[in-house]
Design a protein with these regions (language model features):
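Conserved active-site segments centered on acidic
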Residues: 1-71, 141-145
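Phosphate-binding/catalytic loops
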Residues: 74, 80-145
């Protein structure tokens, strides 16, 4: 919960502010594993966000909770593995809709690559571009429904 999901959270918050609907939304990110609990976003994530004028973003990695499934209309994840994990965690009574953010990728790339082990900032830029494209399409959908 320090690379892709935080990047998507920052982008989505930024887009909501641009569209002047930020106050109507709660945007957050969480992980299902405790590898980075309590840590800030990966430095390369913050560098790429800053390159795109998103500089007011802060976050502390946390685990998704059962409560999240009852307080969130949508829970978006990054790849098939994360979707499977979330589907297994989701309480039967929850009305949250689970999707991969990539389901909204107009270029059809349904999984968003984890750049954490990459040694180039360019991979983070590619993830940013895909997340931005997907967040815009998701917002177009969500604001209509």
């Amino acid at each position: 919960n320090i690379c892709r999901s935080t990047m998507a959270e920052a982008i989505l918050s930024h887009l909501l502010t641009e569209r002047k609907v930020r106050e109507k939304w709660k945007v957050d990110s969480a992980g299902h594993g405790d590898w980075h609990l309590g840590k800030p976003p990966e430095e390369r994530t913050l560098q790429v966000l800053a390159r795109h004028s998103i500089t007011d973003y802060t976050h502390t990695a946390r685990l998704i909770t059962e409560e999240d499934f009852f307080t969130s209309d949508y829970i978006l994840c990054m790849d098939d593995y994360n979707l499977e994990e979330l589907e297994a965690m989701k309480p039967v009574e929850s009305q949250s809709v689970l999707w991969k953010l990539g389901d909204f990728d107009l270029k059809g790339a349904r999984n968003i690559f984890d750049p954490y082990y990459s040694n180039t900032i360019e991979i983070y830029e590619k993830v940013y571009t895909q997340c931005y494209r997907c967040c815009e399409a998701f917002l177009d959908y969500a604001l209509k429904n």
